[in-house]
């Protein structure tokens, strides 16, 4: 057998495996503070209250998500942070919204990140704002070194049972239901039969795309587009989970190991309403008990014990993050 033929076969095998997702790795960043710097890193894609940018570099697909609906709304901030493994925090002003972003990052225990600031930001004041929070642990860089340091960051993956969190869903003519989301655990393969939660609907993965390329499987933490059979777009919502049967909990009441935010000064009372963020889910709830803290939801929530639930009061004129805690 000729050497040329062997080399051809090797190139074909590597290409096939790269395209099928075996060698394609992924990194997801959230860009906070001065969000428009994300445009320098990747090409703009989906735009809603979350804006996504992406770029493929050799065998790594990098995605940057910005909470473009924030600060008008608090909800996209939590959702954008929950979509990322790493944080890029480029501070351009020291106001209550910067404080809110620091509290959100600390609440969600996002301790892997890079911190920079514009020249007009008082560094000592910024340092006092982040003192005692996860942001204090971030790598501090000058803004001109941001990209250089970001390029050193390595992908994080796991081999847990497959799980995907949905962030967008729509109908495509000739294709059907298309779901955009992030593989948070394990790998998802073409023709997998999985469940959509909290509805409990059976879905089959018809096809998978990563960065507009068809692939046979996608490995955590890949961002993917899935064509699915079994669910209509109006049955799918942001925050829904696609996973194997019996690997997640679906309940209408949860108990938290709760810590109230020291910045939220108003008392909480039984039967008071709130919004709760778990992953990408934002659901209306009431305090059914204060000690221990229990929440009752209008619609069931998907979770695993240990997931962080963040309680929000969007109408608050000061801090909109009331408190948080892992779900028991």
Show where each model-derived region lies.
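Conserved C-terminal guanine-recognition region of P-loop GTPase G domains, centered on the G4
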Residues: 77-83, 87-134
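Short catalytic-site patches enriched in acidic/histidine residues
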Residues: 164-186, 208-209
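C-terminal effector/interaction modules appended to NTPase cores
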Residues: 11-86, 91-92, 183-190, 194-328
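Signal for well-folded cores of large energy- and translation-related assemblies
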Residues: 106, 151-154, 171, 184, ...
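Canonical P-loop GTPase G-domain recognition
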Residues: 119-171
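Hydrophobic alpha-helical signal peptides and transmembrane signal-/tail-anchor segments
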Residues: 2-13
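Helical mechanochemical/support elements of P-loop NTPase systems and associated helical scaffolds
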Residues: 73, 97-101, 122, 142, ...
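Short coil/turn connectors at secondary-structure junctions
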Residues: 24-26, 110-111, 161
